[in-house]
């Protein structure tokens, strides 16, 4: 039976302009946000790569041989690519925002199970509001059914070589997340349904 290795890239860059300080170094229950996020993944993966500035690297005090650091990029996309290059294992990779510390262990486990079967998955929360699609004039042109609309979150998980290829082919282009790059190249991607609790810390109110 094949034993696949699971790599995880946890992004730890970003300007935190809207937060007012480096949000990853804010504390939740006496732990920084980035450390809280890292500890959620440690039991389930084989390595964790953290693209980050020296400032953030110095503040991560968790001692574990699974954790490795690499240089953060000017953009999230560059940081993820640096993380991919630093991976030791080349089977499957999860990519997660360091500012999403409320990820549930059950969601991590389901993401790993599904990426092994399906090859590319994205964690997302079903829309609770009615969504309107508009044209460039602001005119509403359609209203999709809510059950078909999801807010994309992380982790997003892929076959390592496929997401590496996507980053290399689309280097320098502005994509909002990794799954968008895979979609652009024609890959099929599947949803792992999660809750809205898996929010990204953007403002101070998000810590409540």
Features from the language model and the residues they span:
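Residues at the starts of beta-strands that form the adenosine-phosphate
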Residues: 5, 46-48, 92, 119-120, ...
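Conserved alpha/beta core of the MobA/IspD/sugar-nucleotide pyrophosphorylase nucleotidyltransferase superfamily
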Residues: 2-4, 149-208
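Residue-level signal for inorganic ion chemistry
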Residues: 10, 34, 83, 96-97, ...
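Conserved beta-loop-beta/alpha segment of the NTase-like Rossmann-fold superfamily
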Residues: 68-69, 75-136, 153
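Short beta-strand segments
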Residues: 9-13, 51, 96, 123-126, ...
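Conserved N-terminal catalytic core of the sugar/cofactor nucleotidyltransferase
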Residues: 33-90, 170-171
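N-terminal glycine-rich phosphate-binding loop and ensuing alpha1 helix
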Residues: 2-55
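Short, flexible, basic/aromatic active-site loop/helix in glycosyltransferases
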Residues: 132-156
């Amino acid at each position: 039976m094949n034993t696949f290795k699971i790599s995880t890239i946890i992004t730890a860059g970003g300007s935190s302009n809207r937060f007012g300080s480096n949000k990853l170094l804010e504390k939740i229950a006496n732990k920084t946000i980035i450390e809280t996020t890292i500890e959620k993944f440690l039991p389930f993966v084989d390595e964790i790569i953290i693209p980050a500035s020296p400032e953030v690297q110095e503040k991560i005090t968790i001692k574990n041989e699974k954790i490795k650091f690499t240089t953060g990029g000017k953009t999230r996309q560059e940081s993820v690519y640096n993380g991919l290059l630093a991976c030791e294992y080349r089977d499957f990779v999860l990519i997660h925002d360091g500012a999403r510390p409320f990820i549930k262990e059950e969601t991590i486990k389901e993401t790993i199970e599904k990426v092994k079967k399906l090859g590319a998955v994205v964690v997302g929360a079903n829309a609770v509001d009615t969504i309107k699609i508009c044209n460039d004039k602001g005119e509403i042109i359609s209203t999709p059914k809510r059950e078909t609309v999801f807010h994309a979150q992380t982790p997003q998980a892929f076959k390592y070589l496929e997401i590496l290829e996507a980053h290399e082919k689309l280097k320098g282009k502005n994509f909002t997340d990794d799954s968008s790059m895979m979609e652009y190249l024609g890959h099929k991607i599947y949803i792992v349904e999660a809750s809205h609790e898996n929010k990204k810390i953007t403002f101070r109110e998000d810590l409540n």
